[in-house]
Amino acid sequence: RQVSSAASDVYKRQLISGNEAAGLGAVYGGATFCSWYPITPSTSLAEGFEKYAKKYRVNETTGKNLYASVQAEDELAAVGMAIGANWNGARGFTATSGPGISLMSEFLGLAYFAEIPLVVFNVQRGGPSTGMPTRTQQSDVLACAYASHGDTKHVLLFPADPKDCFDFSAKAFDLSLI
């Protein structure tokens, strides 16, 4: 959606959520694969990727998609597919939230120690777990920083607004190669 500035129709602005901006950033970052399992509040990030990939990741001659987006049967399958895509040279990612990170931790260690580039979007909920909206905290930060068993230190990016979501998403795919 575009809206006009109150002062003039010359200035146009894009209204976009952080999740949709991250999905668009993933497309600009070169992502061609997304695997995800529906979990609030991250589902709209994968949907944003699909929306923009349909526009920007299509062969102009044949009309065939140059991307894949898979709704997995669970969080383990979602991260496993993303690891497999990256292992085979694609730029793939998954999107989840805190409980999904907990379930993905063993595979996150596999990617880390096998040095397989991987981007995981953790769209954090307001509380420490499901059903805890009155006690907010940032527990996902440590869960992500040291995800898996062993001595892991993952790169974490913390966007503050939709512009950061776009920029950090696009850059995350390059950072995953470090």
Where are these regions (language model features)?
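Single conserved hydrophobic/aromatic residue that forms the stacking wall/gate
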Residues: 1-7, 11
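Active-site mouth loops of central-metabolism enzymes
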Residues: 12-16
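Active-site pocket-lining segments that scaffold enzyme catalytic pockets across diverse folds
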Residues: 19, 24-27
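Acidic, PIN/NYN-like endoribonuclease modules and their adjacent C-terminal/linker elements
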Residues: 37
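Thiamine diphosphate
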Residues: 40-144, 155-176
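Flexible glycine/proline-enriched surface loops and loop-helix/loop-strand junctions
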Residues: 150-153
